[in-house]
C-alpha cells in the first residue's frame, strides 16, 4: 500500500482485528489513536513484517464469530529469536516452565466449540473459553465452582462461580511437574500471539518484570469471591475481544497482587475486562491490564476511588483516567488541612513555626497573603473570638500575634525604624553612616539645643547670642516652633561656628523637645534662678539623658531679686547634674540673657565640652543626610522645610526625600534670608522644592533620581496611613456591642497650623483631653497652611469644627463657611485652644437627671368613663401630686408599671394642677390595670450639673 494507510485497512489486509493492530503498534512505540487513524509507510512496513507478511482473513463461521476475535500467536517468548514466525517447541517449554514454577491456572470450564478457522495453526494445550492462569497470585487460587457452570454464550468468557475450591485434576503423562492438564486442543483454532491482545495477561517478555508489591491495605484476599456477588466474567464481551482462542499462561515469575489475582489493583487472571479496581501493577505493567486500569506502566494500581478509562473501547489501547492522580503537594495540603487548627470554630492553615514579618498596622489581607490563606476565614475566626475586624482594616499588634500563635506562626511586627531601614536597603541606600574611611572625615561645628521650662529665658538667650529679637515675633511671648541658627564666635582668637536649636518649653511641645534632643550634640539647660527647677525642666533633663547628650546648665536671671544660683545647683543634684564646684562634671554658668552677662563664658563652656567629650567629624563629600527639624507651608514659596545637614553636602538641584515628602532642592535659604548654594555638615537651612510638607523630625537624604525619591515617599505614606488607622481604630468586642451601638457624642475637628510641629503638638494635646466615655474627640484631617475651601467642604460633610492655629482662612473659604454654617476658630496660643476644646467637650455631655419624689396617692375607688377611660379616685397620703408629672404604680409595694404620666387631675369638678396631702382627687393615668388599694407614686426628674 503506497503512502499512508489506515489502521482498519491494515487489519483487513493482515487478517486480524483493528484492536490487535493497535496493540502491536503500541508495542512498537507508535501512538495511534483509533482504527480510523493513519500511519506512515515505514510504520506500516514494520507492522507487516511483525505479522509475518500478509495473512489471509479467517472465514466467518455460520453460527458463531468466535474465530474472528481469536488472538494471534506471540511474537517473542523466552528462548525464541525475534525472527521466528511461528511458535515452536521452545515456546511450550517456556510456558510449561512458567506453569511449573507455581503459576496456578483455573479449572477449565466446558464451552461450546467454536467454528474452526480455515487457516492452519499449531496445536496448543488449551481450550477455548478457559480463562488463562492468574499472573500475580499471592497464594494458590481456589475459585472453582462446586457445580458445573452454565455454558456461556459464544464469544463470552465463562463466569467463575464463587464457592468451594475445585478438586485438582490428575496430570497427563509426560506433562511437566506442577503443570495443570489442559483439554485436548481443537484443530483449526488460531493460536493467540503473545502481547498482541490488549486484554491478555501474557505480554512480551522483553518488558521489565515489576517488583513484587505488598497487598493493598483493605483489599480482599487472593482467591476470595468478588464483593457484591457479581462476577466480572458476567459482563458483556468487548468489541473484537478474543473469546474462542486459547490463552497461554503469563511467562515469568508470578507477581504478588493486592486484592485479587491479576495485579495489585485486584485484576482478573486474564488481565481482561471486569477488573474492579484496575491498574497495571507498577512499571512495565501490561497495557489494558484491567477493566479500569491504566494501559502500560501504572503506578501501583489505581488510587482508591479513581475511575480509569475503559481499555480497548472503540479500538483504543486504553484510556487515561478521568481525573489525574493527585500530586504529593496536593496530598500534603489535604493532610495539613486535616491537621489544621480550629480557631473560633474556623479551620485555618497550620504553620510549622516559621516567622511571619508584618508591618505595624497590617490588615488581615496582608497576613493572609503571607500564609496563603483565605482572608475571610481569618475574619470569621476573629469574629467568633469576639473581635470584629474587616479584611482590609488595620489590626493591632497584639491581635496579629495572638492569631499567629494559634496557627503555629511566629508573627513579628516590624518596628517603623526597622521597616524604614529595610525600605532603604531595597534601594541600596543606608542612613546614619558616614561613607569612606577615617581620612575623609572632617571637623564639623557642634549642634547645641537650648532647652528648659517655659518663660525661663531660652529665646532671649538666643536673641542675645544672635544679637536679634526673635521673642517678640512669637505669639504670647512663648516659642511655638523650633528655630535653628548658626552663629560665629571667637574662641582663643579662632573663629568657631556653633549651631543653635531653640525648642519650646510649653508642656504641649514634648515631641519637639524630644526631636531637638535627638538631633543635637550638646544641650544647654536654661533654669531661672528665681523660679528653680520646674516640670518642663525635669522633662528636658530626661530627654537629654535619654539621647546621651552632655548638658551645660545656664542659670539665667541672676540679675533679678530673689535669684539663688546655689539653690539651683542643689536642686539639679537630685537629677544627676552635679556641678564642678561640688566635685561633679557638669558645667554651670550664671548668666543674664537680658543684660548679656557671661554670654561669652557660656559659649566657651559649650566649645570646651564639645572638644573634650565629643568627636565631631563628618564626611562632606558624600550625599547629604540629615533631619527635618521643622516644616511649614508658605503662601508664596510652597512647602518649606528647615533641615539640619548631619553628613555630606546638600546642594541646589539634589533629589531629596524626607519622610513621605519628596522633591528637588530648588532653593536654599539660611537664617538671615540669604540664598545658599550648598550646605555643609551641621548647617541649618530652609529647603524649598518639596512637593508636600515633610513631618517635623523626619530624616531626609539625597537620592540619585526623582523616581527613587517618589517610590520611597509613596511607600512611607502608605505605611503611615496603615499605622494611623491601626492606632485610631477602637476595638469593639461583642460584649461591648450594645454600648457601642448606643448614641455617642463625637466632636470632629480639622486642624490647620503654620508649621508641622505645631500641628502635631496641638493634636497630641487635644487627644489627651479626657472628659467622659460618652463624648469622643476625633481629628479627621490635619495640615499645614491656610484654611481652604476643601477643608470647609470636608467640615460641612462631617459636621466638624475647623481649628486654625496662626493661620487664617482664604476669602472664598470664609464665604463658603458662612454659607455652609461651618464654624472656624482661630488661635495663636496653644493652651487657649486646649481649654476651649475641653469646655466644648464637657458641654456635649448628656445631662444627668436625678429623681425627686413628689408624693403618694392611694386608690380608694375606680370609675369608668366613656370619654376618658378608667378614673382613679385617690386620697393623697403624702406629699403632693402634680398634673403631667411622672408616676409609677405600686401593688403590695411591688412596682407594676413604670414611666406613667398623670394626664388629668381633678378636685371635685375643677381641673387642678396639683393636690396636696390629705385631699381627695380623681386622676387618669392612661393605664387600665388599676385596682383598689394600689398606690400611685408621683416623681419628677431634675437635671443635675456635671462637673
From Swiss-Prot:
Annotated compartments: Cytoplasm
Q: What stretch or stretches form a coiled coil here?
A: none
Region G5, residue ranges:
592-594
HAMAP family linked: IF_2_B (MF_00100_B)
Residue stretches of biased makeup (Basic residues):
322-331
Q: Where is this region: G4?
A: 556-559
State its role.
One of the essential components for the initiation of protein synthesis. Protects formylmethionyl-tRNA from spontaneous hydrolysis and promotes its binding to the 30S ribosomal subunits. Also involved in the hydrolysis of GTP during the formation of the 70S ribosomal complex.
**Transmembrane portions of the chain:** none
- Listed Pro residues bias regions: 105-123, 146-171, 210-225
- Region of interest: Disordered: 47-332
Q: Which GO terms describe its molecular function?
A: GTP binding; GTPase activity; translation initiation factor activity
> What PROSITE patterns does UniProt report for this protein, alphabetically?
G_TR_2, IF2
| Taxonomic source organism | Mycobacterium marinum (strain ATCC BAA-535 / M)
- Positions of region (G2): 477-481
The segments labelled G3 in the record are 502-505
The segments labelled G1 in the record are 452-459
Q: Would the keyword Nucleotide-binding turn up in this protein's UniProt record?
A: yes
Q: Where is the composition biased (Low complexity)?
A: 131-145
Supply the Pfam families for this chain.
EF-G_D2, GTP_EFTU, IF-2, IF2_N
Q: Could you tell me what this protein is called? A: Translation initiation factor IF-2
Q: What Gene3D superfamilies does this protein's entry cite?
A: 1.10.10.2480, P-loop containing nucleotide triphosphate hydrolases (3.40.50.300), Translation factors (2.40.30.10), Translation initiation factor IF- 2, domain 3 (3.40.50.10050)
Q: Where do the annotations place GTP binding?
A: 452-459, 502-506, 556-559
Q: Which UniProt keywords apply?
A: Cytoplasm, GTP-binding, Initiation factor, Nucleotide-binding, Protein biosynthesis
Tagged with keyword Cytoplasm: yes
